Amino acid sequence: FAFASDFNQSLSSWDVSNVTSMGSMFEAATSFNGNITGWITTSVTSMSAMFKNATAFNVSVGGWNTSTVTNMSSMFQGASLFNNSLNNWNVSNVLHMQSMFTNASVFNQPINGWNVSNVTNMAVMFSNADAFNQDLNSWVTTSVTNMANMFQFNGGFNGNITGWNTSGVTDMGSMFAGATAFNKDLSTWVVNPNVTDCANFDLSATAWVLARPSFTSCTI
């Protein structure tokens, strides 16, 4: 249904229990808002870009079984009306969350309960997601290597992330650039001495007056 801009039919009766990839399934299906709440997604490994730019979509999918999914990159990117609960999702096998909520401009649901311990890429995850302002301090981020642009141009975020373990992250470029509401003390973050990019880390983060992390291998 990707780019099927007029499609908006019910798919509630579909048996998708053997489907392994739903990547880009409704990408740019700009009218779709059909009931898929009850889908059995136990075999799915990829939901990458599933609702990317699906600008009408706002259906509850919080009951889906996502325990086998490894890729959620760009899943709700540009899904500008989506604002449903996802906190009960099992994301323990997900590796890729880059751009997951980029430009998801009204999404502001708690996801602090997620087990993100296997995620390696969170780049651009909440960029331009201006409504999002939830605490994420319970996240175990020890596997993450890329947080570049993670909160870039997010004008609303000031959630608690002070307890994150960032010792494995090597790319923090523009992580908070243009995050004009953010103001947290991140002095306790342990920064990887092998960070390759921290340029523009806090560029135009105009509200941030509390302590930054200490970088030894690059200049912010």
Tell where the protein language model's regions lie, with residue ranges:
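Negatively charged
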Residues: 1-220
